[in-house]
């Protein structure tokens, strides 16, 4: 009898991707976040599907429909809170996944890395349009402020903003199209994930040492399937704890108030996972400059492979670069904190310094450290 797993056209692909896939024997827990992101995406699509069955994308009923889901739908409150906190888990895993890629030099798989950056941008867009849907105060004003940034584009800016709004302000047309985008984008993300994995399996996984692991590979199943399963259980435990015990911990209290175009909230701020970029945006006292800095803060990831100056791939054996990496991490946490603070001193100057340091670390200091470490390791004979 032929082995179905190895000969069936579909099972063969699954087998080569998740069962008989040769994987490096030394990949650590930092490599778990790819599979965790896959689980996050599945959770978000399933909870989102059930929410979409009861949600209405109309300005008059959107807020009430969300309240109805929480009050009257069986376990509607749980589905909604899993979806809201699932987004936070998604971004937590995303940031760690990208950080792992930078630390261990995974960005040298350029195709995989570039698709990953596109995925990050798509997930950010999905989260933004999704945040508008409950039609609370922060939903409405967040949408108004962020879409308004496009008006900084010379010549076509104002026309572009009105085109996206579908009118002269954020209104019914905007909400309806944002719901349409929020529904379709996760499926586009799924397709991109397939491409991401396709490119990854062309090269095989990187590993903590950054050395070629071909001499020592082990099958993905059972070694990494069981390891991923442990990751799933831990993540679902954290997500369930969040959704059950403190579902509103990461949300904004202003979103419990229905959207009111006549009343601006005292502090307009996005969800926690956008605060670092929001802080960079606000640190430049010029609209166009701020928008460009905001874009640069994410798009800088694309040029990271070009900034790799070291002969070693990973930071595992490079203490100076390691220090700079953790300084960058601390800097991003500082930016996240600043993004949630009001625009007043000392927060303004801290945000500006942190923004300058962010770009300096990535563009100047880390490449220089790579060159310096190479020179320090070079044997010097008299």
Curated annotation (Swiss-Prot):
Binds 2 heme b groups non-covalently. GO terms for cellular component: mitochondrial inner membrane; respiratory chain complex III. Heme 1 (or BL or b562) is low-potential and absorbs at about 562 nm, and heme 2 (or BH or b566) is high-potential and absorbs at about 566 nm. It comes from Micoureus demerarae (Long-furred woolly mouse opossum). It is a multi-pass membrane protein. Component of the ubiquinol-cytochrome c reductase complex (complex III or cytochrome b-c1 complex) that is part of the mitochondrial respiratory chain. The b-c1 complex mediates electron transfer from ubiquinol to cytochrome c. Contributes to the generation of a proton gradient across the mitochondrial membrane that is then used for ATP synthesis. The keyword Electron transport applies. Gene3D superfamilies: Cytochrome Bc1 Complex, Chain C (1.20.810.10). This is Cytochrome b.
């Amino acid at each position: 009898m032929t082995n179905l797993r190895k000969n069936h056209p579909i099972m063969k692909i699954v087998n080569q991707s998740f069962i008989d896939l040769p994987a490096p024997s030394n990949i650590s827990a930092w490599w778990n976040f790819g599979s965790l992101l896959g689980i996050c995406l599945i959770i978000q699509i399933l909870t989102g599907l059930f929410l979409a069955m009861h949600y209405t994308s109309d300005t008059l009923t959107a807020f009430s429909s969300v309240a109805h889901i929480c009050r009257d739908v069986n376990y509607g409150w749980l589905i909604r809170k899993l979806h809201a906190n699932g987004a936070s888990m998604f971004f937590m895993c995303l940031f760690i996944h990208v950080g792992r890629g930078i630390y261990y030099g995974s960005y040298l798989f350029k195709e995989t890395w570039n698709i990953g950056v596109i995925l990050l941008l798509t997930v950010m867009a999905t989260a933004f349009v999704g945040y508008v849907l409950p039609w609370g105060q922060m939903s409405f004003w967040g949408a108004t402020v962020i879409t308004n940034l496009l008006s900084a584009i010379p010549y076509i800016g104002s026309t572009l903003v009105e085109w996206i709004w579908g009118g002269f302000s954020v209104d019914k047309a905007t909400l309806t199209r944002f719901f349409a985008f929020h529904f379709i984008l996760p499926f586009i993300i799924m397709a991109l994930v397939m491409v991401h994995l396709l490119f990854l399996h062309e090269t095989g996984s990187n590993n903590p040492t950054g050395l070629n692991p071909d001499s020592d590979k082990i099958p993905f199943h059972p070694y990494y399937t069981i390891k991923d399963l442990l990751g799933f259980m831990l993540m679902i435990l954290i997500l369930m704890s969040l959704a059950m015990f403190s579902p509103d911990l990461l949300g904004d209290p202003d979103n419990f108030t229905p959207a009111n175009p006549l009343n601006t909230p005292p502090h307009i701020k996005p969800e926690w996972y956008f605060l670092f970029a929001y802080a960079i945006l606000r640190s430049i006292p010029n609209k166009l400059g701020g928008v460009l800095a905001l874009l640069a803060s994410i798009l800088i990831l694309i040029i990271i492979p070009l900034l790799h100056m070291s002969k070693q791939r990973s930071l595992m054996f490079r203490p100076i670069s390691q220090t700079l990496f953790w300084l960058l991490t601390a800097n991003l946490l500082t930016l996240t904190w600043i993004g949630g603070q009001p625009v007043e001193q000392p927060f303004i100057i801290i945000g500006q310094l942190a923004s300058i340091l962010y770009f300096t670390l990535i563009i100047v200091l880390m490449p220089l450290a790579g060159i310096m470490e190479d020179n320090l390791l070079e044997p010097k004979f008299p």
